[in-house]
């Protein structure tokens, strides 16, 4: 944390094909070891599969999937009087997007399809239909927050 003021957030440039900042952020989350070209090929390949199989605009399908993945509530550990409580808190909009992208990439990598392009395409299509592991993670997070609603007054 800086001593002088806040750090300015860098603005992400929209990707050249779909002109979407969210797609650029997905490319950045998918990227490993600075290999942006590989990440871009995977995402555009997955979008081609989505377009061929559903016939819908892949960016709209992706945005619908993100809407279904992004959490509204999460729990945060808070120490009160020697014991830790899981306190439910609302998720900030930028963190919602980050968590959604992180979960989408994480659970795409765990899928059983042959290539990463297929895995990502299937996970996006599943999430758009409110199924899949990333949506389940969001529901588990909400369930945890709901179960600990009694500790909401410890919010800070």
UniProtKB/Swiss-Prot annotation:
GO terms, biological process:
translation
Mention any Pfam family matching this sequence: Ribosomal_S7
Q: Which InterPro entries match?
A: Ribosomal_uS7 (IPR000235), Ribosomal_uS7_bac/org-type (IPR005717), Ribosomal_uS7_CS (IPR020606), Ribosomal_uS7_dom (IPR023798), Ribosomal_uS7_dom_sf (IPR036823)
Kindly give the CDD domains that the UniProt entry links to this protein. Answer: uS7_Bacteria
Recorded GO cellular component terms are: small ribosomal subunit
Determine if Ribonucleoprotein is one of this entry's keywords: yes
Which GO MF terms are attached to this record? rRNA binding; structural constituent of ribosome; tRNA binding
Assigned keywords, A-Z: Ribonucleoprotein, Ribosomal protein, RNA-binding, rRNA-binding, tRNA-binding
Q: Which NCBIfam families would you find in this protein's record?
A: rpsG_bact (TIGR01029)
What is the purpose of this protein?
A: One of the primary rRNA binding proteins, it binds directly to 16S rRNA where it nucleates assembly of the head domain of the 30S subunit. Is located at the subunit interface close to the decoding center, probably blocks exit of the E-site tRNA.
Task: Family membership, please give it.
Answer: Belongs to the universal ribosomal protein uS7 family.
Q: How does it assemble?
A: Part of the 30S ribosomal subunit. Contacts proteins S9 and S11.
Question: Sorted alphabetically, which PANTHER family does this protein's record hold?
Answer: RIBOSOMAL PROTEIN S7 (PTHR11205)
Protein name as annotated: Small ribosomal subunit protein uS7
Taxonomic source organism: Levilactobacillus brevis (strain ATCC 367 / BCRC 12310 / CIP 105137 / JCM 1170 / LMG 11437 / NCIMB 947 / NCTC 947)
């Amino acid at each position: 944390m800086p001593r002088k003021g806040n750090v300015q957030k860098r603005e992400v440039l929209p990707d050249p094909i779909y002109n979407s900042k969210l797609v650029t952020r997905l490319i950045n989350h998918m990227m490993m070891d600075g290999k942006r070209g590989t990440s871009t090929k995977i995402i555009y390949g997955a979008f081609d599969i989505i377009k061929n199989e559903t016939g819908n605009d892949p960016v709209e399908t992706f945005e619908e999937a993100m809407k279904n993945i992004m959490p509204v509530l999460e729990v945060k550990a808070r120490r009160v009087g020697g014991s830790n409580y899981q306190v439910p808190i609302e998720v900030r909009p930028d963190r919602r997007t980050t968590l959604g992208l992180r979960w989408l990439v994480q659970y795409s990598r765990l899928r059983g399809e042959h290539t990463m392009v297929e895995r990502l395409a299937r996970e996006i299509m599943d999430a758009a239909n409110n199924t899949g592991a990333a949506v389940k993670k969001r529901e588990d997070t909400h369930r945890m927050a709901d179960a600990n609603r009694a500790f909401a007054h410890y919010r800070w």
